[in-house]
Structure formats: C-alpha cells, structure tokens
Swiss-Prot record:
Provenance organism: Chilobrachys guangxiensis (Chinese earth tiger tarantula)
GO CC terms of this entry: extracellular region
Keyword Secreted appears in the UniProt entry: yes
Domain remark from Swiss-Prot or TrEMBL: The presence of a 'disulfide through disulfide knot' structurally defines this protein as a knottin.
A Pfam family of this chain: Toxin_12
Protein family according to the UniProt entry: Belongs to the neurotoxin 10 (Hwtx-1) family. 46 (Jztx-7/10/12) subfamily.
Residues annotated as signal peptide: 1-21
The name this protein goes by in its record: U1-theraphotoxin-Cg1d 1
Record's subcellular location: Secreted
Keywords of the record: Amidation, Disulfide bond, Ion channel impairing toxin, Knottin, Secreted, Signal, Toxin
PTM-bearing positions, type Proline amide: 63
Amino acid sequence: MKMSALFVIFGLALLFCNSFAAELKATGRGCGGLMDGCDGKSTFCCSGFNCSPTWKWCVYARPGRR
C-alpha cells in the first residue's frame, strides 16, 4: 500500500515536471515574469514588471517606484 502511494506521488510529480517543461519550451518567452531573475543587461522583465536593483529579480511596476 505504501509503495503504490509512493508510485502515484512520483508519477504525478513527473507528469507536472514534464508538462511544465513542455509549456516553457512552447512559449519561449524572452522576458521574465514575477520573481524571475534579471540583470537589466542581458535578461529583461516583461511588460508591467521592473528589474529590482536590490534583489535582481522582476517585481511589479508601480507608480513612484524607481
């Protein structure tokens, strides 16, 4: 019983990873979304996000934010 539960959990995790990789490959975005790493030189944030100079990841663009 324990072994079959482990197989189910492992199978679901494998399915999730496979679908995530397929979607990432299909979209092929060249820009970063929320909390994606950026440096402002070679990697950039998508529209609506700014690269945080402190944390080096994309954050929501807000009025008054540098």
